[in-house]
């Protein structure tokens, strides 16, 4: 999961046509830097979200975004594309996401993100494919993501969503699981215990995670950091994602430690790099630079884009829109 780039790259789409944005996203020129491709992606997302008022343009934006799945070599970009499609709330994206989730030629990190996006869309028509992948996919992260997506769709449409009293979140993202409801009145130690209990359903552990995120204190951050000891790579990558959302320097030491784990799954390390870029505190620069030649593509690319984010956060630029090239 990856939303922490969006707040840095989203700009008004008036500067480019949809076709120009598509050409930037798919790197038609062969010369477009990765950061500009992300900028184009999030601009197209803005259009795709307007399906209620501009259905034809929104559908075209979905189609243009989906072109990235065809021949692109950047696993990082494709997984971000899947994430973005899920966040649009536009069900026109569901058929493409189902295809990507089931396509064994796509990288597991991309297929996992496609499954998560189907959960974010709340697409009931995807339940059969999600159940199939949850049982049969060869990669555990994809199976676990399908389990979460199934639970989220059932929570959305089964009545629980309307009955629970959830804290008003500071974050606009549609997450893999909702936070635990306020009526649970759990303390931070209790939430930490649930977070780290492998006997509990993954969906419930995620709910504890997002409740801790919404609390957002240093104590909650330290509780979340204990989740980096979990066995599940999917779970650990979500902890890193949450830290990027919170944006607190208190999370930096644990993120640096996780990024440095050479034996760790790439999806975890890359998410830690993104989170460090989103936090954008001065001490992260040298750390990110030290991984610019990392042997893992998604880690290296995440550091490149994270440093671009840092430069923007610490510049006086007022405009950060893509340019056609």
From Swiss-Prot:
Cofactor(s) the protein needs: Fe(2+)
EC main group: oxidoreductase
Record annotation: effect of changing residue 270 to A: Abolishes iron-binding, substrate-binding, and enzyme activity
Enzyme Commission number(s) of this protein: 1.14.99.29
Residues recorded with modification Phosphothreonine: 187
Top-level division of the source organism's lineage: Eukaryota
Activity-pH dependence: Optimum pH is 7.5. Active from pH 6 to 10.
Reactions mediated catalytically: [eIF5A protein]-deoxyhypusine + AH2 + O2 = [eIF5A protein]-hypusine + A + H2O
Binding site for Fe cation 2: 237-238, 270-271
Mapped HEAT-like PBS-type repeat ranges: 77-103, 110-136, 202-231, 235-261, 268-294
SUPFAM superfamilies in the record: ARM repeat
Consequence the record notes for mutating residue 116 to D: Reduces enzyme activity by 97%
GO BP annotation list: microtubule cytoskeleton organization
Gene Ontology MF term list: deoxyhypusine monooxygenase activity; metal ion binding
Primary location recorded for the protein, binned into one broad class: cytoplasm
Entry's cofactor comment: Binds 2 Fe(2+) ions per subunit.
Pfam families, alphabetized: HEAT_2
Keywords: Acetylation, Cytoplasm, Hypusine biosynthesis, Iron, Metal-binding, Monooxygenase, Nucleus, Oxidoreductase, Phosphoprotein, Repeat
Outcome following mutation: residue 238 to A: Abolishes substrate-binding, enzyme activity, and impairs iron-binding
Annotated GO CC locations: cytoplasm; nucleus
Binding locations of Fe cation 1: 79-80, 112-113
Modification type N-acetylserine: residues: 2
Protein family membership: Belongs to the deoxyhypusine hydroxylase family.
Function, as annotated: Catalyzes the hydroxylation of the N(6)-(4-aminobutyl)-L-lysine intermediate to form hypusine, an essential post-translational modification only found in mature eIF-5A factor.
Extra remark beyond the main annotation: Present with 39900 molecules/cell in log phase SD medium.
Name of the protein described by the UniProt record: Deoxyhypusine hydroxylase
Organism the protein comes from: Saccharomyces cerevisiae (strain ATCC 204508 / S288c) (Baker's yeast)
Classification of source organism: Eukaryota, Fungi, Dikarya, Ascomycota, Saccharomycotina
